[in-house]
Regions:
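Bacterial N-terminal signal peptides
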Residues: 9-18
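Short beta-strand segments that buttress and anchor functional surface loops
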Residues: 45-46, 101-108, 129-136
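Hydrophobic ligand-binding cavity/cleft-lining segments
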Residues: 22-95
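Mid-length scaffold segments of soluble, non-membrane domains
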Residues: 81-121
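Bacterial N-terminal signal peptides that target proteins for export
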Residues: 1-9
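Short, highly charged C-terminal tails/helix-capping segments
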Residues: 192-203
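Hydrophobic/aromatic beta-strand elements that line small-molecule binding cavities or substrate pockets
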Residues: 57-60, 90-91, 113-120, 143-150
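Beta-strand/loop substructures that line and gate deep hydrophobic ligand-binding cavities in soluble
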Residues: 132-182
Length: 203
């Protein structure tokens, strides 16, 4: 048996016996400015929704001003989106005032079309999102928000999400590629790198 397979078996056994039943952090948990300045993403498992499931908070620093990052994050038509390895394709279904409905296909579930309602609060640099068709995506619910805050000439991003689906807890604790931590680490680093390539379009 290979080392990776053995480690996975041990992890699953620990998971099934309650080894990973660790206390979740408060949603208000934050890294310090000094920690953020390293450029590293900070990932926290936070208290879940009262209905159950799992939740996370991802906090990271992006090296552009807040207005530039806000335009970038709310550009749902951008070609750059499909450079993200987890997004196969995306299209905008409807836009009305501060609400944008998008549909995308993810590499992890090519057979499902995820339809997201995004509510933009431009004066607060906040974007709320909710999965409108959870049953079609084998989920019970999935919602959260992005909050941007200026930090000098850079922007602090706080990404919070609450979700539930079969295997959600296993995904949340899985420590390798394919688990929550690897996914969120990639998302943050992809955004940090991608905005630098296209920022001239949003200045």
């Amino acid at each position: 048996m290979g080392n990776r397979r053995l480690a996975l078996l041990i992890f699953v056994l620990f998971f099934l016996t309650g080894f990973t039943n660790l206390s979740a952090q408060s949603p208000t948990i934050e890294p310090s400015e000094k920690q953020l300045s390293t450029g590293e993403p900070f990932i926290y498992k936070i208290e879940p929704d009262a209905k159950g499931g799992e939740a996370y908070k991802l906090v990271y620093l992006v090296p552009v001003p807040i207005e530039v990052l806000w335009r970038f994050k709310t550009d749902f038509h951008g070609d750059f989106l499909e450079t993200n390895k987890y997004i196969k394709n995306q299209r905008v279904i409807r836009e009305k005032q501060n609400v944008v409905i998008i549909e995308n296909r993810l590499s992890s579930r090519l057979g499902s079309k995820f339809r997201w309602r995004n509510i933009l609060f431009s004066n607060k640099y906040r974007l709320d999102f909710v999965l409108e068709n959870p049953e079609q995506c084998d989920q019970k619910f999935h919602y959260g928000h992005f909050q941007l805050e200026p930090l000098g000439a850079h922007t602090k991003v706080s990404h919070v999400a609450y979700f539930d689906f079969f295997g959600a807890s296993l995904w949340a604790y899985y420590p390798w590629e394919g688990g929550m931590y690897a996914f969120l680490d990639y998302i943050a680093r992809w955004e940090q790198e991608t905005i630098l390539k296209v920022k001239d379009d949003y200045e």
